[in-house]
């Protein structure tokens, strides 16, 4: 079953993306390098729980 996750910028800008992942096949936390429009650079985004 796919679940929605929140990817938060490591640049501490408050910007985030939402994505889905299959937690049964990939139980580890996701870390992806994506563009942060606030700082206008590519930074690491880390998975956090959606409240």
From Swiss-Prot:
**Is this entry keyworded Calcium?**
no
> Does the record bear Transmembrane helix in its keywords?
no
Taxonomy, superkingdom = Bacteria
A GO molecular-function descriptor: structural constituent of ribosome
| HAMAP family per the UniProt record, alphabetical | Ribosomal_bL33
PANTHER family assigned to the protein according to its UniProt record, in alphabetical order: 54S RIBOSOMAL PROTEIN L39, MITOCHONDRIAL (PTHR15238), LARGE RIBOSOMAL SUBUNIT PROTEIN BL33M (PTHR15238:SF1)
What is the similarity comment for this entry? Belongs to the bacterial ribosomal protein bL33 family.
Cross-referenced NCBIfam families: PRK00595.1, rpmG_bact
Q: What is this protein called?
A: Large ribosomal subunit protein bL33
Q: What high-level taxonomic lineage is stated for the organism?
A: Bacteria, Pseudomonadati, Pseudomonadota, Gammaproteobacteria, Candidatus Pseudothioglobaceae
């Amino acid at each position: 079953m796919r679940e929605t996750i929140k990817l938060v910028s490591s640049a501490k800008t408050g910007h985030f993306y939402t994505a889905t992942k299959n937690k049964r096949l990939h139980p580890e936390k996701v870390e992806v390098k994506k563009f942060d429009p606030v700082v206008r650079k590519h930074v690491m985004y880390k998975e956090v729980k959606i409240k």
